Amino acid sequence: MSKPIVIALGEILWDMLPTGKRAGGAPVNFAYHASQNCAESYAISAVGNDELGAELLNDAHKAGINTLVQTNEYPTGTVAVALTNGIPEYTIVQNVAWDHIGYTDELAEAVSKADAICFGTLGLRSQESHDTIIKLLQHTKEGALKFFDINLRANFYSKELIEELLGYANIFKINDDELIMMREMFSIPEGNDEEACKWFMDRFDLEYTILTGGATFSTIIAKDGETSTLLTPHVEVADTVGAGDSFSGSFTGKILSGASLKEAHRAAVNTAAYVCTKEGGWPAYPTEGVPDYLAAAAK
């Protein structure tokens, strides 16, 4: 039986951590973790014709990510990451290779075969990549999961962009801090966080809305009314880079493989906890599988 196909659209880059550089970019982090959870993953992005670009593609291939990555004359993307108690702050270099992803029929054909697509706001910050990604989203097949992780960074977003991307999505992931901003931006009626998530579901006809609360909880609401809430297990944190993306990729891979909402949610929480114990967004998975931190916490 063939594996489901997952495609990530947007940034591929180096996270320049205090301990050294690590391959990353939210959509590609997603693709990596989907590939570790029963999916065949591809990244659509761009790197520069430079040493960093060649090294980045090599790392992606070694990690099991198939790349549909263009090479252009702009520098490969980098992000300076400062860590405070393991929590990252990002300084994102502008006008880099992934700001110049060009549309091709080959990319459109790949997207048309995907069972799931992942995208966020950052990858569309430039007009060129915005136009390409929007055009590619128009080629998704019926029934595909279209995962929009809002993933707000710096000032690289607007209400118009968020509305546009929600119009293409059927899964929406947002964290509790971002939800506060979205309440004001969209003038969401007063109510608890779950009601605010349901507001997005109703307005944009979403299949799932995912709300994460970092070190405390996560809630997933399905269109049919099923809800799953899990507390975040406590682990010794190396850094949280890519943890949210690992949650998303794991959840999507499991759903595509036939897992129930609760099964997929549990796998996502355990995966994110595991990633927090490692440096960078693409840690190797244990041969025996990710530990069941939730089971350990329940004892």
Where are these regions (language model features)?
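Conserved phosphate-binding/catalytic region of the ribokinase-like
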Residues: 1-4, 190-299
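Conserved N-terminal subdomain of the carbohydrate kinase-like
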Residues: 40-121, 293-299
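Proline-centered loop/turn at the N-terminus of a beta-strand
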Residues: 5, 145, 171, 207-208
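Glycine-rich phosphate/adenosyl-contacting loop at the front of the ribokinase-like
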Residues: 1-65, 79, 236
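Short, conserved phosphate/pyrophosphate- and ester-handling motifs at nucleotide-, phospho-/glycolipid
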Residues: 34, 175, 244
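Conserved beta-alpha-beta core of the PfkB/ribokinase-like small-molecule kinase fold
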Residues: 116, 121-195, 217
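Structural alpha-helical scaffold elements that stabilize or flank donor/cofactor-binding regions
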Residues: 109-110, 164-165, 202
